[in-house]
Amino acid sequence: MSDSESSAISNNASDLNPSPGQENSMPQLETLISHLVAAKRSLSSINHVWRANEIVTAARSALEESVVVSARTGFLRRGLNNQLRLLYSVRTEVQEVSLRGRSEFATVLKSLDVADARLRKTLDLLRDTIVHASFRPEGEESKTLHDFVDERGVGELHTTLKRSIDRTNAAQADLESSNRAFDDELQSIKEALGNYRAATQLASSRTSASSSSPSTSNDSLPSLSSIPSMLHSLEMHAQEMANLLESLVRHFDLCVTAVKHTEGGGAAARSITGDVPATVHVNGRVGPNIEEGINANLNAPLDPLSNSEYQEMVSVLIKDAAEAEDVVMEIQDRIGEMETVLENVLAQRDSVLSVYNATTSVFKHLSTLASTRLSGYIAEAHSFTRVWHEEYEQIQSGLADLSDLNTLYDGFLEAYDGLILEVARRRQVRHRVEKVLRDAKQKLDQLYEEDVNARETFRVEQGDYLPSDIWPGIGREPMRIEFRRISGGNLKGIAAEPPDQDAAAAEPKQEARAVSSGDVGEDGEVIPELPKALVEEAIARFNARMRHLP
């Protein structure tokens, strides 16, 4: 609110009442009284000014207490840090040994599980793959590829790996038991330290929230640098609130004066101003004595005002009346902000006290650790490391063996598919050979018949004229050609096998007959006849393997 209202009232003006025309343009008495009532109501803000004085006093006391307690906490903290750093560095090292070993062991076990699952899957495929009956002697029971595999090596490998895993698990269990015992001894200290850290972090967070420079560490002591600035802010708010209250008092005085200078307003002014507040003190400064000033204003004789002075006073009053509510709101906002700042100051003081109490509690608990078996905990960690290094090599060797076995068995599956494809290829070649033979025989027979007919025609037409001894072969039939199958020997690089007696006894011209769902030729070679679906499945598996090759 401006100070123009105080200059709007002139004590040297002549006593002139407003003319009737002017009275129509000036506000009515009821309007001025409403402004006076509102101005009186705004003076209740003096309670906020009183509260502001209390807040400043409480904040100053909290600052003094915080400084003393913070100094004590800092002294204890310097000794506490070294002891805690040593204690928890040992615990951290032991825990890292356990975590590192557990992580490495878990990784190795995962690799073992993957390799073992892959091997078992391959073995299951061997069990599920039935050897086609055409590959085996007639009358033999059905067999799978797994029947041709000796799993004793797999069982022995599993036994070796299980022994290494059990020994590692036992060493790890001993280390975990040792760490739990260590944790039991540290539990009381951890509880006290947890309270200490919680108090420190809370104090640091409050300090960071009220300060423009955040704390560098959650475990650092709370800074008190923001409290003096907050105290200064409270003092400035209290001073400004007192100034705002003075402006409200001046506005109230102006309203009283305006009502009194309005016809019929004197009695109303005395009735309204009968119970106003008294003096207020702000930071050692005595504020306006509202009651005495108002009584003096009410009881003082009216100074005469000219029409222009009265109009100017009313204009200032109306303008200030529009701003009075804003002034009251500003006082309320400032006292609200002061309450918030005081809460922060007291919270920081309480945080400093809680950190101090937590620090002394940690020191008391540290004394119980004098007989801690630190050497035993460290020795247990070293023992686990030694065992793990020994068994790690053993497990890695077993992992390589599992991979080799899986490669071997997977190669068996692949070779069986190759066998199916090879049989299909041989049957295709056999069919092509037979076709060539049939075509050749047909052509040879045709040539033979043509030759016989031609010779007979020649004999009939010319034979009577030729002497029989002119050429002995004139009356002979043409030669005949026959194909004979010869049993194949072993491929190069394969040792010679004794000849198959049954095949040797077979007649050269004997027709092919079915043996064990296959074809046996005059050469004794049996080529199984496989179902088309079986061959197609083998081709699909072969193509799938080729797609997965790098």
From Swiss-Prot:
Location of region: Disordered: 1-25, 204-224, 492-527
GO cellular component terms, semicolon-separated: Atg1/ULK1 kinase complex; phagophore assembly site membrane
Organism: Aspergillus oryzae (strain ATCC 42149 / RIB 40)
Bilayer topology term: Peripheral membrane protein
Free-text function comment from the UniProt entry: Autophagy-specific protein that functions in response to autophagy-inducing signals as a scaffold to recruit other ATG proteins to organize pre-autophagosomal structure (PAS) formation. Modulates the timing and magnitude of the autophagy response, such as the size of the sequestering vesicles. Plays particularly a role in pexophagy and nucleophagy.
Pfam families: ATG17_like (PF04108)
Gene expressing this chain: atg17
Protein name (database record): Autophagy-related protein 17
Coiled coil: 317-350, 427-457
GO biological process, one term: piecemeal microautophagy of the nucleus
Subcellular location: Cytoplasm; Preautophagosomal structure membrane
Composition skew (Low complexity), residue ranges: 495-507
